[in-house]
Structures are given as C-alpha cells and as structure tokens.
C-alpha cells in the first residue's frame, strides 16, 4: 500500500460540509507489524486511545452542539485509522443536523468500527463533563534527569545491555523525550513514553538512549509503541510489561497507544503538552 496515494496526508484538502464516513482511511496494521517480525495475532493486548477536541454538529433546530470525543480502538482490530482522515471525518459533522448526542455517538461507533474492522468505543462528553483521571502513570520515575551522551538517532536495540543478575523489581519509568516522525510527511510527532514492568532491572541510562534513538524513525504512533514494547519484551522477557505513549495534539486529536502483556486499560489523563 503506497501511503502517499491512499491517504490525505501531505495533500491540500477541501474541508467537508456534510457528514460522510467516506473520509475515513483505514491502514492495515499487518503491514507495519511485518517489519517487526509479527504475523498473525500478536501476543500483546492494548488499545489506541484517541481524544477529539474539535467536535461539533447542529441540533434539529440548527443550533451548534460541541463535545469532547473519547475513542478507544482495540489493538486487535485489523486497521488503524489515518489521523488526517479521522480529523476530516469529524469535521464532516459540523454542518449536519442530528437529533441528539446519542445519535452522533452511535453513528461514530458504527463508522469507526467498520473502518477499523474491530470494536471501537465512543464516548462524547460535554465540555463541563470532562474530568482529568487519576493514574499510577503519573508517579513514574522520569529518566530525563540522567546526564547521557547520545549520538544514535535511529532505533537501535543494541543500546540496551543484556540483563544481569537474578534480582526482580517492579517499577514505572517515563521520558518526555520520545520523538518519531510521520511516515508520509516526515512531520515530527512528540510524546511522553511510559514503561511499567516487573522483571530484571532495566539499565536506565541505556533505556533513555534507546528511547532517544527513535528520534529519526518514521512510523505511525501505534507502531512506534509496538516497536518499543517488542524490543523490551524480546530482550528482557519481563513477567509484566506495559508501554504507553501519550502523544501531543495535532489537528484537534491526540493519540495514546498502550500495549501490554496483561489486561490494562489506557488511563485518560492530561499532560502539560496535551
């Protein structure tokens, strides 16, 4: 699949005036997963949590309504949804009339599930309904205070040393230094990366260097998280592992992929850059 031909990315686009699900562009997960050595159903679980901040439609009398959208796409769906197409799809509601928020919610659930070829949860919140969520991720130890020398800016698992000893720890780590790039436009994507694990201790300076090594990598948010998850799982085989990235907002959307080897929902908390 040639992404440049089949997506809206990098192209001038007229914004829609009428609701249509045809704006949604699905991209098979399998294509990027092949580059990670994955075929068939992956061993991890998780979801892609999207927040939509620019969402509006007209009620039956023509008065605008606004909402915040929370969309959860399971990682075992066949497709991701390309982000600009998601934005255009949401914009297509702007001048269309609907009888209720519940009608819009049900329609989005149907359209997004069809595009993703998997279950999608949709929750529309009024501006006054939204509340920040508590989360254990907020207590993560931030690695960015470490003073490291860096000269590798493409993903390099060899930066991670082999595990040493038999000690077992359980801890949550984070870094605000994750940067990856859109595979079509090259536009930078910025995120805070979280890692929770139980297993042999990770060498923290080396882990930070590995995170920084993603800096020139080109891939979608979802697959960057899967790459980090698989690298850590294959190298250290921890008993528990969860990798969660909260990306900064673009086009009224932020994308927050979570991958783990145990059941875990993506907490929807806000960071200063979101």
UniProtKB/Swiss-Prot annotation:
Pathway: tRNA modification; tRNA-queuosine biosynthesis
Pfam family, one: QueF_N
Annotated positions binding NADPH: 83-84, 250-251
Active site per UniProt: 182 (thioimide intermediate), 189 (proton donor)
Localization per Swiss-Prot or TrEMBL: Cytoplasm
GO BP of this protein: queuosine biosynthetic process; tRNA modification
Name of the top EC class for this enzyme: oxidoreductase
Subunit structure, interactors included: Homodimer.
UniProt name for this protein: NADPH-dependent 7-cyano-7-deazaguanine reductase
Organism expressing this protein natively: Hahella chejuensis (strain KCTC 2396)
Gene: queF
């Amino acid at each position: 699949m040639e992404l440049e031909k089949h997506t809206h990315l990098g192209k001038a686009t007229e914004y829609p005036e009428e609701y249509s699900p045809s704006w949604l562009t699905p991209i098979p997960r399998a294509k990027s997963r092949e580059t990670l050595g994955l075929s068939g159903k992956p061993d991890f679980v998780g979801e892609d949590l999207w927040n939509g901040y620019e969402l509006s439609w007209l009620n039956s009398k023509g008065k605008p309504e606004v909402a915040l959208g929370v969309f959860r796409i399971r990682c075992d769906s066949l497709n991701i949804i390309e982000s600009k197409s998601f934005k255009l799809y949401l914009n297509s509601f702007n001048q269309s009339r609907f009888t209720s928020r519940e009608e819009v919610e049900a329609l989005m659930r149907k359209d997004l599930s069809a595009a993703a070829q998997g279950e999608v949860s949709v929750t529309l919140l009024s501006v006054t309904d939204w509340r920040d969520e508590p989360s254990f991720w907020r207590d993560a130890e931030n690695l960015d205070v470490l003073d490291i020398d860096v000269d590798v800016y493409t993903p390099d698992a060899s930066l991670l040393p082999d595990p040493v000893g038999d000690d077992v720890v359980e801890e949550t780590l984070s870094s605000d230094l994750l940067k990856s790039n859109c595979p079509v436009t090259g536009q930078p994507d910025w995120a805070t990366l979280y890692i929770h694990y139980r297993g042999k201790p990770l060498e923290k300076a080396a882990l930070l260097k590995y995170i920084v090594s993603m800096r020139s990598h080109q891939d979608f948010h979802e697959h960057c998280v899967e790459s980090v998850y698989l690298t850590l799982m294959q190298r250290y085989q921890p008993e528990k592992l969860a990798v969660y990235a909260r990306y900064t907002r673009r086009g009224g959307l932020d994308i927050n992929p979570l991958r783990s080897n145990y059941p875990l929902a993506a907490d929807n908390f806000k960071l200063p850059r979101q």
